[in-house]
């Protein structure tokens, strides 16, 4: 398993910037799991670019504030996704061309996909609620959010079914099961 993770990091499809707030700690390597899931998502989406993703691990109070500010929903949530790209069709990277300078980091040349914010408290409580490990819940939330960064949504049943199938595919690829 460790060899698989090292190989993935050497192939490096992305830069991952992680910031952590608060006192709650998750008892696994959050960076390693995030990199593994993000890499699998990029591969399955057939992303033609090296990508940049920002990940903020926070607590309920902070994500509650962001959820209210960004979505008008007055409660904490498990994950928020802030895509940088507007796709015509989910996962269709053809809307981006080399001329779309604002889509790429001028220093690294990487495609700036967007930001993911995860509540560590929700990772722990939902893992307990659903009867699986926090590592699995965290990986699932990263997979879910990556699909939002690719333009997928789950507001209507048809989109939800597609998104759920893709989430399952990502989770199977990284080998993290319920």
What are these regions (language model features)?
Residues 1-139, 147-178:
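An acidic/histidine-cluster motif and surrounding catalytic segment
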């Amino acid at each position: 398993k460790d060899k698989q993770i090292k190989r993935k990091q050497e192939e490096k499809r992305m830069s991952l910037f992680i910031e952590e707030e608060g006192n709650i700690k998750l008892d696994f390597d959050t960076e390693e799991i995030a990199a593994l899931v993000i890499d699998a998502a990029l591969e399955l989406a057939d992303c033609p670019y090296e990508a940049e993703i920002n990940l903020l691990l926070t607590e309920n109070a902070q994500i509650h504030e962001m959820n209210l500010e960004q979505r008008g929903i007055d409660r904490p949530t498990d994950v928020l996704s802030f895509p940088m790209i507007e796709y015509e069709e989910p996962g269709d990277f053809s809307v981006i061309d080399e001329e779309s300078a604002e889509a790429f980091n001028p220093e690294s040349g990487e495609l700036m996909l967007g930001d993911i914010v995860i509540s560590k408290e929700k990772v722990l409580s939902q893992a307990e609620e659903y009867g699986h490990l926090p590592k699995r819940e965290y990986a699932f939330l990263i997979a879910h959010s990556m699909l939002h960064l690719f333009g997928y949504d789950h507001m209507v049943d048809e989109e939800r079914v597609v998104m759920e199938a893709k989430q399952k595919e990502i989770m199977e690829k990284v080998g993290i099961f319920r």
